């Protein structure tokens, strides 16, 4: 079939398998160009490995460090009549390129929050790898099915205490709007912590540790974002921030446990990037369009792949073997360039000046749109989008 982009809300409902493969190929090429990561991990589990930072982590491990990888994700395959999700095609492409280089690659399509997923991964590690020396936790899900009760809990991207009103961009109409978001209830805050906090990360690490499949020096990392006062009302000071603070709590508990044998657990605070996850957060697309333009001008721009490669090579797996630099809460900070005072001041000054008319001139909004559509495999140079493609793509994946 011939596949064209169809946007609804902040999701593109169609995906292009060839375009998604090209995205993965580009990230692999970028990793290889940067060179091998000295002291890198060799056996890596990535929970949430099909897009965004999770996918880049799997690529950094495999193509930057020749690691065997197991990827866990929840994606929909394509059929002959309908494309699958971008994450399915990303994972299929990763698997193809990893196997072509003789790298071990296994993938599990399942609900990562379930007990079954954890048991299956343990079984697979025991059978094929013995132990893993790195676990990346990179889930971004709006809903979690509690593994014991089966209850469905939903997260809320809302402020706390008062209604939040700010200038934002309507990405469908390409115009500047006033976005108003009502505050979260106590229940919504608690639910957001349940879905996006550190509880499931702890369940994963504890299950893996009890099964004896973590190496003594195993490192685990979970991803977070803090930002600055520009996005704090909706993010760090909102319901989502409470969940990310719970991630910090979990990191401390896990680090206390893993450090006994020489392992570690850290939250890595990353920069804002164009992902399916960030596009859903009110105000983030406009902020990203502003900050990206300034960071590009300063020569500091990084996408997911550059960020993660830097985290691997300059933080967790340093060539000199030294312990990574952390902040006072033991977090790895890779938002250091974005948070530079001149960059944040630029955004503070610019925010009130942005109108529908000058949006493309003052910010990287057009680039934001292009990067967003690229997540789904569209708008990539060298691909003929009028050509017939088969949306049904098979690969070596375990379905639970």
From Swiss-Prot:
It is an enzyme of class 1 (oxidoreductase). Keywords: Fatty acid biosynthesis, Fatty acid metabolism, Lipid biosynthesis, Lipid metabolism, NAD, Oxidoreductase. Belongs to the TER reductase family. This is Enoyl-[acyl-carrier-protein] reductase [NADH]. The record marks 75 as: Plays an important role in discriminating NADH against NADPH. PANTHER family: ENOYL-[ACYL-CARRIER-PROTEIN] REDUCTASE [NADH]. It comes from Shewanella oneidensis (strain ATCC 700550 / JCM 31522 / CIP 106686 / LMG 19005 / NCIMB 14063 / MR-1). NAD(+) binds at residues 48-53, 74-75, 111-112, 139-140, 244, 273-275.
